[in-house]
Structures are given as structure tokens and as C-alpha cells.
Amino acid sequence: MPFAVPRALPLTILAAFVLAGCAEKGAAPLKKDEKPVDVASVVRQKMPASVKDRNAWADALAKTFESQKIAPTEENICSVLAVAQQESMYQSDPAVPGLNKIARKEIDRRAESMHIPVFLVHTALKITSPNGKSYSERLDTVKTEKQLSAIFDDFISMVPMGQKLFGSLNPVHTGGPMQVSIAFAEKHTDGYPWKIDGTVRQEVFSLRGGLWFGTYHLLNYPANYDEPLYRFADFNAGWYASRNAAFQSAVSRASGVKLALDGDLIAYGSSEAGSTELAVRKLSTTLGLSNSDIRRQLEKGDSLAFEKTDLYKKVFALAEQKSGKTLPRAILPGIQLESPKITRNLTTAWFAKRVDDRRARCMGL
């Protein structure tokens, strides 16, 4: 909301007021004793010489930090590079082993769930696509998510069977060097510094787009974390998942109810109370909050404002009173990673620690 500033307001107070407002909306400013660095130069220095397009990475990240007003620090740069290394080994469009089999399995799964004979789907895939090859031939040679996304876009728009199986929803959900969510990118285009000629989905698969939206997801939100580890977990599990998991742990201590520490404070998309909300309701009398108060304040769990609610403060006060010690305000969520691309037993905590190790090594270079 626009606001007017009195002319007589001292400049120092005005500056502090503006900076405070910016901190609420986006990335945190420089920390005390942190020095700004030249983003492009640091990227060139930190990236392996084997990466052929280091200059393109340097230019894209410099523009990204500038346009998003991200503090240009070595830690922030290394945090972005660490995620990109973990997710793609610095490839803007990384190859996915066995992607053709994964894609065909997903198509067959959709067909079976909709009671469509698989042979009909396979027949539809033999139709010639816009590039002159059949969809089946393109699937046989697909190597990257960018290629697969293009196949599905064509299949959905050109073939009735594609529309029946997928509607208007392309089943490729992430892309680019940081494997950022395409749905996230589509909701956060404000301030994007380059002209988008095609769709946001297509832009995510470019180096500049993948880095810009990935950096936005990683760094462009205010959080009171004392180490980057928790931002890496949030990158995987959603903004504030680490803070919310710590809150769930406090709720569990205060109520005696065992909870999954997944960072989801409400059952999103439903008016029904989820497990965390039900556990908090058991404390309603002690907290002096009604069920509607509890719901309304839990709904702020996707923002920094949640930490200012009576619910957040009172739950931690009660849990600390019962445990006799100060409790952490952030913990790694206990979430099992699920994706057709994942063949091992991996968790959000594993991901966050791996990325943090890469960040630390980057800062040691």
C-alpha cells in the first residue's frame, strides 16, 4: 500500500524506516561486518574451470542479485551456487538418467488411473508431432526435463488424448539449474529483468530464468534463521518449513501429542483441521485462544508475521516452561523426498546438509 512520509522526518529515521519495510518484504540486508562483493567476479572465481559458460552464469547472477536487491555477499553467492551444484552440477538443462522410462511410466499411470486402455494411449503417441517425429520417437530419445516439457506441451495442445490425460497441466513440475518449481516461478514474475518471449515455464528452463527464480525461492524472503542450512531446507520443503517444524516440535512438547515435523501448520486447500491444528486446540484454554483464533493465526504460517502472533509466542513459552530450557526456533523438517527421479531413501534434512557442505566448501575457495 502506498504511504506518504512527512517532509520533516529526519533523513536517518526515514532511511531506517524504508530499510525496515524492505526487510519485511524481501531478502535480508547485509549483516553486521559483512562486506558487499562484486557478484560476477566472485561467481567466476568460485565456479569450476570445467564449466564452459561461467561468464553467462556470472552475468545472470549479477543481474539476478541486482534486480532482486539480494545482499551481494560471498555467503549468498555460494548458497545459490551450492544449490545449483547439488541439483544440476552447474548444468542449465541437466540430463536425467532414464527419463524416457520415467515419462512413459507416468503416462501409463495416468491412463490406468482414468481407466483408459494403455494401447490407445500408445497409439496416440505414434501421431506425428510438430517437429516431424512421432511423440513416441521423441520420448525414446528424451534426455532433459526441458525436452520432456516441450513434448508434453505439444501433446497436450495438439492431441485430444493428451488433453484427456493431462488437461492443461504439464506434468513436468521443476526445471533449470536449481530445479525450481515452475508453479512458484509463475507466481513470482514481478521484477523479472529480462523480456519473456515465450511462457514462464519455458523461461525456467533457461540459464537466466532458472537462476533468477531459483535465487528468488532461496533468498528473496525474510527469515530469522541464524545459518543458511535452514534456507536450504526451505528451498526443498517450502518457505518457513524449518521455522514451522520447530513450532510443531514446541506444540508436541506442550500438548503431549506426537506430530510429524513437516512444516505444514494447516491442511492446505481444506477447511478441516489438520493434525497440528488439532494438537494446538488441546491447548486452547491454557493459551486463552479460541479455535477460530488458532486457525486464523496458523494461516500466517507462510509468512514472517506468524512469529508475531500470540499463538507462536504462547506456545513456545508453554513448551519452554514444560521442558525447562530454551527451544530452537528452527529445525530441519522430517520429510521424505518423493519423485520418480529419486531412487534412494532421501530426506529434506539430507538435502539441506549436502547443500550446506557445498556452500562451506565454496566459501573456502
Mark where each language-model region is.
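Cell-wall glycan-active module
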Residues: 2-3, 17-365
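Substrate-recognition/specificity elements adjacent to catalytic centers across diverse enzyme folds
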Residues: 14
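Bacterial N-terminal signal peptides that target proteins for export
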Residues: 1-11
